[in-house]
């Protein structure tokens, strides 16, 4: 699912609620300036890419993945609902997971607004709120 022209700006918070599929291996949330580049990639990995029960954040720019960040807990369960909160400050994205654990991820592209949000993988997104 791709959502275009939905502005996410510095000072705002995005709240994503969904349900991981019962047999999910992974799913991802992507925020960026366009469909090619991703300033914040949140990849929830139950069993994918050689990782188990890990959240990996990264960015994708100019056709290349950058350095991975692995912080926070893993409050996700296959077949269960989840909530991901993303606070957008000038310097970083503060990602808060359902259990209250946090991931600090730099705003590597430095923009004050991103307009494309997409979701990949094995989760059903129920709501997206920006406030």
Task: Label every PLM stretch briefly.
Residues 1-2, 118-131:
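C-terminal helix/juxtamembrane-tail motif
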Residues 1-58:
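Secretory/extracellular carbohydrate-interaction modules
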Residues 16, 84-103:
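Carbohydrate-binding surfaces in secreted/extracellular proteins
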Residues 23-25, 36-39, 92-94, 102-105, ...:
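Eukaryotic short linear interaction motifs
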Residues 53-63, 119-124:
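Short, surface-exposed secondary-structure junctions/capping segments
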Residues 64-83:
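Short, aromatic/His-centered strand-loop micro-motif at the edge of beta-sheets
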Residues 99-114:
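Short, solvent-exposed beta-strand-to-loop segments that form ligand-recognition rims
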